[in-house]
Amino acid sequence: MSSPQLVAVLERAQSLGHIGPGEIDSYVKHAIAHLSAADPTHGASWCDLGSGGGLPGLIVAVERPDLMLTLLDRSSTRVEFLEQAVRQLDVVDNVEVVEGDATALAHNNLYRGAFDGVFCRSFGSPSATAECAIGFLGGTGCLVVSEPPEVSPQRWPLKSLQALGFAGAEIVDGPPRFAKLAVATPPGLDVPRTWKQIIKKPLF
């Protein structure tokens, strides 16, 4: 059951266009399923990549106050909303909101390899998501990505993932469905590339 404060925050996100149309409760249930698929250890540090309207980050913050969360988004408008939402939900002690380009922040010493896990709901293509996320993950970290309902064996090609530093992709069947990508080896120092390079020449 969603709290009135959380519903109000997500309704505002919806009115601002930060999340799509539909029932708020369905977004909350999806975020809780995302958290369940990730199964973070107590006190772990996680990043919500491209947090947008706070899905799943804000729900995770409410459900798991033991976690240290960083909500990352490049839009100043969305970041302003997230900062207000964090105060409204009284989760300021365990949530940091960061504005910036993921491809740049992943090379910042404050964030590179700093997280036990990365949540991602709708950041970009699988290739762009994997390339950006691995820069934020520590040596035993894990990326947990929301997946479309239809199965696509080519969505996460093993050789391409291994070249980045992931062990592969484990699919958590739902509904909803998620992909879990565990780090096997540290990424190269040039990973991730710039957005221009990522878009022009995707890795897969």
Regions flagged by a language model, labelled:
Residues 103, 107-117:
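A short acidic, Gly/Pro-enriched loop at the edge of an enzyme's catalytic core
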Residues 155-204:
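SAM/dcSAM-binding transferase cores
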Residues 140-149:
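Conserved beta-strand signature within the Rossmann-like core of class I S-adenosyl-L-methionine
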Residues 91-102:
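Conserved SAM-binding strand-loop segment of SAM-dependent methyltransferases
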Residues 53-66:
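Conserved SAM-binding loop of SAM-dependent methyltransferases across substrates and taxa
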